[in-house]
Amino acid sequence: MKEVVYWSPKKVADWLLENAMPEYCEPLEHFTGQDLINLTQEDFKKPPLCRVSSDNGQRLLDMIETLKMEHHLEAHKNGHANGHLNIGVDIPTPDGSFSIKIKPNGMPNGYRKEMIKIPMPELERSQYPMEWGKTFLAFLYALSCFVLTTVMISVVHERVPPKEVQPPLPDTFFDHFNRVQWAFSICEINGMILVGLWLIQWLLLKYKSIISRRFFCIVGTLYLYRCITMYVTTLPVPGMHFNCSPKLFGDWEAQLRRIMKLIAGGGLSITGSHNMCGDYLYSGHTVMLTLTYLFIKEYSPRRLWWYHWICWLLSVVGIFCILLAHDHYTVDVVVAYYITTRLFWWYHTMANQQVLKEASQMNLLARVWWYRPFQYFEKNVQGIVPRSYHWPFPWPVVHLSRQVKYSRLVNDT
């Protein structure tokens, strides 16, 4: 391997990516190896490096010190001529004066044998700590939001006007496509397939704690938003085919049983647990179809393009079947897609950029209400989480062929 001082800018960029510091690739795109090892703390107090990381570049500087030691770079060389260092010695002469006699010091290449103190970087914690306690809190948050949603559906159901009094609102999609009775079952089957694929993929992920924590935070927030939108505006049923459950008129015991039945059935019509009306704005089915696809694509290798396309088709067909069944207004689906994709992209943009994890006047994303919980969940995650997989089960993997293809331990990102 070439010494660091001879590295090209491309080699420097590759080294940054290998060490999970992609945020430095753009500011250091023209840096050679010599420029890299010459970086000091002062460089991180000036633009553009001062805007990259919240730790003043300490992690990168520690990695550079480690790199110097790995390649035996000597930071404190004494610049002497080649060969043995000649030392001048005063020798008295017969006339009482002194002459200088040159003696070699016996050290090759003219270096003095001196003790050099090399700063050793402190042993830092893992860049991607699991922190299962935080993941459990995120799970409780998502579970609470899901339970609150079922309670809100039961409350809103009591306010939905009868379809004979308030007919369905006009909808452009309904004007062009007649209702297909079995379409909503296709939607829910696609959703269950996507959730199953995501669960299998999650089990094989190396950093499953971090990724599941992100999933719970996002899905919990989406269902919390849904509680608000369905409560503040109650829309009439989107079709005359709806047969809503009878209203209970304050019978809290019956409402509690209905809520428990809805939770046990996962809120799905295909399980017979969901026969209430009013939970239209916005579509929870669209949320799950969209969010599972986004997580599947984000945390799987780019080379599995066929897998991404299959999941995308399942998601798109499922969303189309929601409308084809006339079980949601078009605006319900549009709003659900918009909120889901934006929240997913905002969260991951903030999680992948260290500078966005620190509140400042320049960071406008720090003004969202969920920024403090975000900081708590993500503050110890350094950089982009690799798409790394491992076998989580005690029994070994069975190879179907004698020819084993070796690949990098870390999956392509």
UniProtKB/Swiss-Prot annotation:
Top EC category: transferase
Hey, which stretches end up on the Cytoplasmic side?
Answer: 325-413
The active site lies at 285, 328, 332
Q: Any idea where the SAM domain is?
A: 7-70
Would you tell me the Gene Ontology cellular component terms?
A: endoplasmic reticulum; endoplasmic reticulum membrane; Golgi membrane; Golgi trans cisterna; membrane; nucleus; plasma membrane
| Activity regulation, free text | Inhibited by bacterial PC-phospholipase C inhibitor D609.
* Pathway participation: Sphingolipid metabolism
According to its UniProt record, the EC number is 2.7.8.27
From the Swiss-Prot or TrEMBL record, give the protein name. Phosphatidylcholine:ceramide cholinephosphotransferase 1
Query: Would I find Signal among this entry's keywords?
Result: no
Q: Where in the cell is it found?
A: Golgi apparatus membrane
Q: Which residues cross the membrane?
A: 136-156, 184-204, 215-235, 276-296, 304-324
